[in-house]
Amino acid sequence: MTSFSTSAPCSAPDSARRISPEQTNQVRPKLPLLKILQAAGAQGEMFTVKEVMHYLGQYIMVKQLYDQQEQHMVYCGGDLLGELLGRQSFSVKDPSPLYDMLRKNLVTLATAATDAAQTLAIAQEHSMDIPSQDHLKQSVEESSNSRKRTEEGNIPTLPTSQYKCKNSREDEDLVANLTQEETSRLDLGFEEWDVAGLPWWFLGNLRNNYTPRSNGSTDLQTNQDIGTAIVSDTTDDLWFLNESVSEQFGVGKKVEAADPEQTSEEVGKLIDKKVTEVGKNDDLEDPKSISDDTDIEVTSEDEWQCTECKKFNSPSKRYCFRCWALRKDWYSDCSKLTHSLSTSDITAIPEKQESEGVDVPDCRRTVSAPVVRPKDTYVKEESSKHFDPCNSVEFLDLAHSSESQETISSMGEQSDNLFEQRKDTENMEDCQNLLKPCSLCEKRPRNGNIIHGRTGHLVTCFHCARRLKKAGASCPICKKEIQLVIKVFVA
């Protein structure tokens, strides 16, 4: 972007175009540029710089040369504008190709009366390297005033076609009604337009269709020699139009970057929103299917993984909850384990030892008279195996321990037999309960399974169970809400 550079001398045509507004007000476009302006609705052959830029914007709008998604990009390949620019596309953010084209295709009106003044102005520009501060401030104020006046015409929110026509008519009326002094103030040099990028009315027509893609903009400041130019990111659709005049321009003033706290807060809100949306989709299982799971102490380490569908299930479940595959190495399907050291054997030891002479007093236990626990006695008998049989006392202990081991093994076999008998008895009782009639009607067999959560009770017939479900009654056994009733067939 062009800045107030003073390192190189200006050429004669460029200097002629930068003559003060009192001397030159209008320019004459060359024939290729004039065709483009007339295609956009321009009439006549004499225009101001503002009118030329306005009709260029109208031409881009009518031909729809801008990208619908990224509207700052203008694709002019195969068009008269592209042939005039000598390129396929350009960006509004970098309007230097457009400025170069205007410098080559705009001819200022020089009369015999102004030739001497132009020569004097060129000589003064070559002799003065640095523009005065008054000239810079005046240029900035004039640019800001023109923007402020024309900004009021962009406020109404109308449909796109109506907005374009209205905006174009307002611009034409504005140019027609301006006095000679006001018109001269609008005809600023190209370097003065470069202070804030393209003028407002070039993007103003695109503003109705332009969607801002960022909530903030980043201002950069570059120093070239003594003059300072402000380079602004206008992806948020001309944010400077909504700011005050003091915030829009400042030649030689430091521009602060965007507030980092505001940016971090906006990023944090976006992250919280994404986490909330993901959290809503985490629970993919039916909440009714797990509402009756009362085992809250089961951790993920205790769960077993199904070999078919790789789902983790509760350790108390025999079948996979998802695919109903049988759990691998389920204890009911394994070979019978030996119960020589089972719980029943351990409980049988103190009964025998207490009956063999361990006197339990009726008073409280004291420190001087501890009670001999069966577990300690059993550990002593186990450790006596490792003693040397050469010692007579240890040999007697070994003999005693061998006798006690035989007694323990015989008692273990008896307890196993009792356990099997008890288990068979329970199975018979369960079978008899299943063979009993319905607990409600006492006529039909128990084939109605009442399901609640992950458990169920088989105490009624299917007919009575369905009646309970329709009546909204609870399970007659556990008083839980009946969720489902199924019919059971015993093979």
Curated annotation (Swiss-Prot):
Where in or outside the cell it occurs: the entry states:
Nucleus
**Entry GO MF terms:** ubiquitin-protein transferase activity; zinc ion binding
Keyword annotations = Metal-binding, Nucleus, Phosphoprotein, Ubl conjugation, Zinc, Zinc-finger
InterPro entries assigned to the protein according to its UniProt record, in alphabetical order:
MDM4, p53_neg-reg_MDM_2/4, SWIB_MDM2_dom_sf, SWIB_MDM2_domain, Znf_RanBP2, Znf_RanBP2_sf, Znf_RING, Znf_RING/FYVE/PHD
Gene Ontology terms: biological process? negative regulation of apoptotic process; protein ubiquitination; regulation of biological quality; regulation of cell cycle
* Predominant subcellular localization, coarse grouping: nucleus
Which residues does this entry mark as bearing Phosphoserine? Answer: 342, 368
**What is the recorded function of this protein according to its Swiss-Prot or TrEMBL entry?**
Inhibits p53/TP53- and TP73/p73-mediated cell cycle arrest and apoptosis by binding its transcriptional activation domain. Inhibits degradation of MDM2. Can reverse MDM2-targeted degradation of TP53 while maintaining suppression of TP53 transactivation and apoptotic functions.
Q: How does it assemble?
A: Interacts with MDM2, TP53, TP73 and USP2. Found in a trimeric complex with USP2, MDM2 and MDM4. Interacts (phosphorylated) with YWHAG; negatively regulates MDM4 activity toward TP53.
The UniProt family comment states: Belongs to the MDM2/MDM4 family.
- For this entry, the protein name equals Protein Mdm4
What are the leading ranks of the lineage? Eukaryota, Metazoa, Chordata, Craniata, Vertebrata
Give the encoding gene's name.
Answer: MDM4
